[in-house]
């Protein structure tokens, strides 16, 4: 009985490992691809599935390529949000600021202003350290 349970656990572990390796291989293939539309769609899928690190890696490259196109605003906002959700708050605040300045009347501008403040707040250090990021977060909340 006990041996049977161990075999079952081992089988489950092997299947999970194979699936994880398959997903990683797919990401690597997409990342190396020159098909930007496919990369963009895959990045959106990663974002929807909560794979924000992969989404940020793909969108970071696509933001400059899509500048001036119909997908530019959405790709920049999704890139910033991917950084935020993967806890890279300093880079996220910069990306959200870029979103605000590049598209001042855009679809995501109001939300981007809010997330500038949130990113700065999240990156604030503990009270005994330099509070420049905290003051910047307070100002960003006031601007929002």
Regions found by a protein language model. Name each.
Residues 2-4, 19-144:
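Acidic, polar-rich low-complexity tracts and alpha-helical solenoid repeat scaffolds
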């Amino acid at each position: 009985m006990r041996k049977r349970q161990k075999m079952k656990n081992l089988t489950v572990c092997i299947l999970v490992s194979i699936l994880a390796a398959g997903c990683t291989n797919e990401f690597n293939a997409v990342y190396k691809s020159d098909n930007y539309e496919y990369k963009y769609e895959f990045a959106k899928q990663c974002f929807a599935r909560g794979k924000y690190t992969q989404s940020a890696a793909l969108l970071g490259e696509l933001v400059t390529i899509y500048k001036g196109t119909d997908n530019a605003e959405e790709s920049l906002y999704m890139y910033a949000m991917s950084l935020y959700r993967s806890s890279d708050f300093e880079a996220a605040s910069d990306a959200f600021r870029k979103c605000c300045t590049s598209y001042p009347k855009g679809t995501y501008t109001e939300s981007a202003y809010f997330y500038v403040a949130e990113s700065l707040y999240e990156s604030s250090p503990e009270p005994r350290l330099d509070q420049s990021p905290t003051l910047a977060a307070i100002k960003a909340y006031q601007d929002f």
